[in-house]
Amino acid sequence: VKYRIPILILALLLMIPSAVGMAKTRINYDMLDYLPEDMDTVIGQNDLMEDFGKGAFSFIVVDGMSDRDVDSLCERIKQVEHVETVLWYSSLADITIPKELLPDSIYNEFNNGDSTLVAVFLDSATSADVTMDAIRQIRSVCGSQCFVSGMSALVTDLKDLCEEEEPVYVGIAVLLACAAMVIFLDNWLIPFVFLASIGMMILLNMGTNYFFGEISYITKALSAVLQLAVTMDYSIFLWHSYNEQRQLHSDPKDAMAAAIRATLTSVIGSSVTTVAGFIALCFMSFTLGKDLGIVMAKGVLLGVIGCVTCLLYTSDAADDK
């Protein structure tokens, strides 16, 4: 208890490298990276890259554009970095030859009314960062008359959607947790102390993921909300213990020390059970479980440290009731 000021200063200083580490941690959007190496899908993807130099692919639906303009568009797409092949009618025959001369079975595969289909193959993996950059460049080249589809385009949209919505649902979770604690706790300031402490531990957890090199987008999307939900109970538990000890000790610092001693074993026991559940995910052959399990187990441990630390400052908040 007597070292609470140095502990607070240390925690605040750790937020700086944590923020840097969080920004530098790569987010992996490729689910193939988490599949076992002996799966046919992974073997096929590796063979496609090694033997044919093709990994990602995309289909572009071109609507209401003349054949000459489509041919010009294909040439511009070929200039995009990491585009390996662009397949369209002009890849098989000169565009001066009417497409209607093709057999119906072939013509109908690539044309429907005023729309035509262009296939694009890239020399990079389906969800690589350079692939997503290439998809964005292709979309900027194509304009509003074209619709880019395929797995790589889906992953690109998924990344943009996750980055856009994550702050929204994390903010909603914080507001709901804050509202619940304000209603059910006997001190209006305590919820903000708890949320600040847990927020710091979430940032520390996300920042230390830098040492893993990368985490999956699913882990990134879920870990903050899960850590908030799982570790908030520990703070509330300790707060109620502090209130009980406050009736027995006139000095708030003595009450804090007694509350920590009285509840620390229970909190650690509960957290170990939670950590064990997340560690169990590490034994999945689908290694996304390992990715999520390690991050969340680390988050729970940091959450326990944070909630015990945050109790050191509740006496000041209690005096402001």
Protein language model features and the residues they cover:
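Active-site-flanking beta-strand signature of metal-NTP-handling nucleotidyl enzymes
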Residues: 57-63, 116-120
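A general secondary-structure junction signal
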Residues: 62-64, 90-92, 150-152
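Extracytoplasmic
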Residues: 38, 42, 68-121, 156-160
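Solvent-exposed, non-transmembrane alpha-helical starts
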Residues: 31, 35, 59, 67-72, ...
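Short glycine/proline-enriched coil/turn segments at helix->beta-strand junctions
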Residues: 53-55, 66, 82, 140-146
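Membrane-embedded transmembrane helical bundles of large multi-pass transporters/channels
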Residues: 1-27, 126-316, 321
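Solvent-exposed, non-transmembrane loop/terminal regulatory segments of multi-pass membrane proteins
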Residues: 23-61, 96-111, 126-130
